[in-house]
Amino acid sequence: SGGFDFSFLPQPPQEKGPMGLMGPRGPPGASGAPGPQGFQGPAGEPGEPGQTGPAGARGPAGPPGKAGERGVVGPQGARGFPGTPGLPGFKGIRGHNGLDGLKGEPGAPGENGTPGQTGARGLPGERGRVGAPGPAGSRGSDGSVGPVGPAGPIGSAGPPGFPGAPGPKGELGPVGNTGPSGPAGPRGEQGLPGVSGPVGPPGNPGANGLTGAKGAAGLPGVAGAPGLPGPRGIPGPVSGATGARGLVGEPGPAGSKGESGGKGEPGSAGPQGPPGSSGEEGKRGPSGESGSTGPTGPPGLRGGPGSRGLPGADGRAGVIGPAGARGASGPAGVRGPSGDTGRPGEPGLMGARGLPGSPGNVGPAGKEGPAGLPGIDGRPGPIGPAGARGEAGNIGFPGPKGPAGDPGKAGEKGHAGLAGNRGAPGPDGNNGAQGPPGLQGVQGGKGEQGPAGPPGFQGLPGPAGTTGEAGKPGERGIPGEFGLPGPAGPRGERGPSGESGAVGPSGAIGSRGPSGPPGPDGNKGEPGVVGAPGTAGPAGSGGLPGERGAAGIPGGKGEKGETGLRGEVGTTGRDGARGAPGAVGAPGPAGATGDRGEAGAAGPAGPAGPRGGPGERGEVGPAGPNGFAGPAGAAGQPGAKGERGTKGPKGELGIVGPTGPVGSAGPAGPNGPAGPAGSRGDGGPPGLTGFPGAAGRTGPPGPSGITGPPGPPGAAGKEGLRGPRGDQGPVGRTGETGAGGPPGFTGEKGPSGEPGTAGPPGTAGPQGLLGAPGILGLPGSRGERGLPGVAGAVGEPGPLGIGPPGARGPSGAGVNGAPGEAGRDGNPGSDGPPGRDGLPGHKGERGAGNPGPVGAAGAPGPHGAVGPAGKHGNRGEPGPAGSVGPVGAVGPRGPSGPQGIRGDKGEAGDKGPRGLQGLPGLAGQHGDQGAPGPVGPAGPRGPAGPSGPPGKDGRTGHPGAVGPAGIRGSQGSQGPS
């Protein structure tokens, strides 16, 4: 009951054990029927890391086994060496940024609104009033008043009244209609494509995931690095012919689709230059085999810029230029098996960069791209000046209202000046300095925790620390009064907890030390006879409570990478039998606290007496002394952390009532003072495991146990976040554009100028420094391994990029020319994240034929014209994988054979283990920006802009002439006197 629990020993397997070591890779056979799953071999010792053997075909999954008990973890399989990374393909040159379209001319000003009508004239002043009646005649002698004389004549009209105040201003006339829109400005020509920014250094390599579930198909043979762009001449035909592809290395394991072929620069057609290196925009080629590129061809002539074509579509747009003849392939790395995923290998150094091929001659310019998008309409021109406001005339006498003044005419719009010539192209801007290598990408997120490996071997439980001798049971004092309850000292010793299965690195649990203030409730010490509870001294049979064996030093937190193998769950120590509670005597009167007697040897726990009623709660006595800590038990091997046993119920603390009379136990004598702690004797046998108390604090970590062999690989974590792309170096300054002359009269759009010839290729940027490898992320879980797809034949060409490719010379003999001198590496493009596996296409036919021998380095032959596209070859049977020969010298680029029709996309092969990510190179410097092309003729006049705001009110018109005086009215009749 209290002894060791041997459940930690290996039990019959419940979960699948680790995979056995993989055998060497066989040649790829036809996919056979999946074999049955082999038996699991016993775990071997961890071997030296072997070379990764080829992956065997994956057997079908067996029926799920019963959950066995955890087996012993087998050794981790050796880590295969990472395959050599293919050379990075060159990144296509980025199309130049187009020049901005010319701004449309300002629209003609809208006509001015007609001035409002002149306000009505004021009313004429009143006529003079009729004069007052003359004085009455003198009275007659009889005093009678004579008749009132006739009214005097109407006084003449008074002077004209002041002119009436000007009538209110006429309302503003309606806003003139917006002048007709001027014709649209000519479409801005498409600017020259901007120079591609320097290729940023590739983001840090994503972590290599362990291979887990079927990864995506192997990394594409790294696409050959694009040849470094030659110094950019003035971008000539914007779409140069595709440069020769570098020699391609042998296909790596079928990877996911390679990056799209470099995009040719779309542009307007320059005159056809000699074929150059930039390819017509390729469809996404099959995964290019990376190879070294051929030697740099002479730069093409620098043509004037063609008109700007529409920007080529990304990626899949044109057909990739014919593939260069296949140079000697670099040896394909042997495909490592997707073995057990070992821990990720250290990143291999990046394979040597292939030398960049020389840029081929500038290819014929593509046709002129369609006109660029129309420039945006110019802003509305300023509103024409309002017609001059007439001067105010003198205020005449008010006359009849004059006619409304004419509306002021809108001033005529001046003709637009002729456009000045475009300034000569400014000198090419210098290349921007190489940007510093991008920051190291953020470390990928932590991979998800793989499934726990099988538990490590369970360490044998260390010997239990010797249990101190049990003190002798003190004699039961007479139950004095309940002393004040001491702080709950260590509760009666929890019998030394039976060792919980050797808990991982916790050393064997020594005797439980004082669990700090109120230690976890141990077994509720026997409420035994509630003796003088004074100090809950070493009640019960526990000797001095040993310290809890120091919890083994917790192994350092493993890297949080792969989750450490979860050791076996140690068996939870069985709970010792709970000591039976002593009988609680009936509460007696609280006696005085007796002296604590010496602790006698612990007697066996008596049978539980009936629980006494609660005694009175005495005052809290002083805490008993802590027992000495027993020596720490030897640290067991770290097993997996035992599962936590269920926490035993915490003994209920009875209400401490008044101490009742002790029951069947004799009357307790007063507790004597505590005797000195006895020396720690040899550990008695472990007591029964009490119910687990509350967990004590974790002690200092014990020494790490022996690490069990690694478990099978965990499930692959998610791929770490891709590091941010390195900063792009600053783009070289664009040559300054000469100042534009004044806009010319809008003419018909002239024909596009002749495209200039392509400028010489820019010089290659320096080879980037390798960035530090990114941190490897945990591998994703390995998926089912698909059969490797046969590399598809070259697919049919997609639509050509804008502009037909110039004719290429006839293709030379198909055999590889002797390798030329390798060009320098271009900057590696950043790796895109691995593409998802596409739906498997039909398997392309693999052309038969062995690669020709690598010739000695010959001079590069001239590019022949592009031959007609070859038909699909019949699918040869895949030959057995030969061993990789040494890499031959890179031959010069042979003439490109005709571009084969693009085969159906091969089925995606398994994603091979992810090769080590090469360190990112520094971004090459930009080629110089080509000079801007000449300004095209001014386009037609843009539509009129919106009308401007209504003009201010016109000035008041001159007053009209004073009309003739009206006819004098007839005299009114005399009013009554």
From Swiss-Prot:
Chain intervals with Basic and acidic residues compositional bias: 641-650, 902-913
Domain of life: Eukaryota
Protein name from the UniProt record: Collagen alpha-2(I) chain
Lineage, uppermost ranks: Eukaryota, Metazoa, Chordata, Craniata, Vertebrata
Tissue: Expressed in bones.
Modification after translation: Prolines at the third position of the tripeptide repeating unit (G-X-Y) are hydroxylated in some or all of the chains.
Miscellaneous comment: These protein fragments were extracted from an ancient femur bone collected at Cueva Rosello in Peru.
Function: Type I collagen is a member of group I collagen (fibrillar forming collagen).
Provenance organism: Scelidodon sp. (strain SLP-2019) (South American ground sloth)
Gene Ontology cellular component list: extracellular region
Subunit structure: Trimers of one alpha 2(I) and two alpha 1(I) chains. Interacts (via C-terminus) with TMEM131 (via PapD-L domain); the interaction is direct and is involved in assembly and TRAPPIII ER-to-Golgi transport complex-dependent secretion of collagen.
